[in-house]
């Protein structure tokens, strides 16, 4: 199975850290859409349009704000479960099977939300644009 990654850099505890996001497969992406579907129509009405198309980034924030605490936790756990942090010895999973694999993020809500937002935007960008994903894999295995 091919895995597609995207790297992002975040400041965690005063240190720049590189995170590797694994793109959601088609089934997980569809589940993500199913989770968010009830909030999309309202967000789409409020989002600004660029060249007649709604920008995905403008949709995600209002959807995040509308999610119930349980839905937000489910979304974050999915995104963090598809994320690794680059350490000196190699990549370490951020979360595995609902447990923190890299506990430095456990109390860093801002970084966890940013990772979740980046993951959602990247995984859904092709859906709203009407074409396939525009992201190019930085690394595939």
Residue ranges and their predicted role:
Residues 1-11:
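Short acidic, Pro/Gly- and aromatic-enriched capping/linker segments at domain boundaries
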Residues 21-25:
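Short, proline-centered helix/strand-breaking motifs
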Residues 26-141:
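Short, surface-exposed, charged amphipathic helix/loop patches that serve as local interaction elements
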């Amino acid at each position: 199975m091919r895995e597609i990654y995207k790297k992002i850099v975040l400041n965690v505890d005063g240190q720049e850290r590189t995170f590797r996001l694994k793109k959601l497969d088609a089934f997980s992406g569809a589940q993500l859409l199913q989770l968010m579907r009830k909030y999309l129509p309202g967000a789409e009405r409020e989002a600004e349009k660029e060249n007649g198309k709604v920008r995905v980034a403008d949709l995600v924030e209002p959807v995040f704000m509308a999610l119930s605490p349980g839905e937000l936790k489910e979304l974050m756990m999915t995104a963090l479960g598809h994320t690794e942090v680059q350490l000196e010895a190699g990549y370490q999973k951020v979360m595995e099977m609902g447990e923190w694999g890299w506990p430095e993020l456990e109390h860093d809500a801002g970084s966890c939300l940013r990772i979740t937002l980046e993951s959602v935007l990247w995984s859904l960008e092709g859906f709203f644009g009407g074409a396939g994903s525009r992201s190019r894999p930085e690394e595939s295995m």
